[in-house]
C-alpha cells in the first residue's frame, strides 16, 4: 500500500464492538510505521444507535476526520449502516459488510420499514461490495460477540502487505486474556 493517506470508516450500532475494532486497527497500522489518527463518534451507541469511527493513516495525517467522498473502505457491522454512510465512500471504494439486520428504533416503533435490497443499492451506487454473514462465522468461532474480530479478519485480506502475525499480535496486546483464544479464532475465520 502506498504511503498516501488512506481512510477507513468502521460503522455499526452500539454494542457491536466497533470501538475495539478501531483500537485493533490503529495498533496494527502503527506497528507498520504509519501516522494514525482515530476519531470516534458515538451517537446513541448505548441504545443501539449508529456508531462510526474514522481511521486515517499514512506518512503524515493532520486531521482525524473523514469527509464525504474520501473513505477508501467502509467496514460495516450491519448493512443498513453501510447504506447510511455510503456518501462517505470514494468513487470505486470498498465496502465490507455483515449482512446482519439490526432494526433501528424507527423500525421497532413501526414508524418505518427496514429498507429492501440494501446490497443491491450499494452496488448500484458504484461501491465494490464484499457482503457476507459474518455473524454466523463469529458464532462458529464461539460467540456472536466476536463479529467485530471476524470483520477485522476480512479487512486484513485487503492489506496483503501487512503480515497476518501483526493482526494476530494486536489481539494479544489489546484484548483481555480471557477472550484472546476466541478472538484469535475469529480473526482467522474471518479471512477470505
Predicted segments with their positions:
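Active-site cofactor/cluster-binding pocket
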Residues: 1-192
Amino acid at each position: 500500500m502506498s504511503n498516501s493517506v488512506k481512510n477507513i470508516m468502521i460503522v455499526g450500532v452500539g454494542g457491536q464492538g466497533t470501538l475495539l475494532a478501531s483500537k485493533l486497527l490503529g495498533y496494527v497500522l502503527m506497528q507498520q510505521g504509519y501516522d494514525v489518527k482515530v476519531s470516534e463518534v458515538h451517537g446513541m451507541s448505548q441504545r443501539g444507535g449508529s456508531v462510526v469511527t474514522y481511521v486515517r493513516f499514512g506518512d503524515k495525517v493532520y486531521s482525524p476526520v473523514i469527509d464525504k467522498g474520501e473513505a477508501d473502505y467502509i467496514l460495516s457491522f450491519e448493512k443498513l449502516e453501510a447504506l447510511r454512510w455510503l456518501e462517505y465512500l470514494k468513487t470505486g471504494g470498498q465496502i465490507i459488510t455483515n449482512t446482519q439486520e439490526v432494526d433501528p428504533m424507527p423500525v421497532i416503533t413501526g414508524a418505518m420499514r427496514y429498507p429492501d435490497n440494501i446490497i443491491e443499492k450499494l452496488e448500484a451506487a458504484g461501491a465494490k461490495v464484499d457482503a457476507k454473514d459474518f455473524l454466523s462465522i463469529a458464532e462458529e468461532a464461539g460467540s456472536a460477540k466476536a463479529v467485530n474480530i471476524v470483520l477485522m479478519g476480512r479487512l486484513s485480506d485487503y492489506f496483503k502487505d501487512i503480515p497476518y502475525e501483526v493482526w494476530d499480535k494486536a489481539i494479544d496486546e489489546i484484548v483481555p486474556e480471557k477472550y484472546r483464544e476466541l478472538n484469535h479464532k475469529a480473526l482467522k475465520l474471518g479471512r477470505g
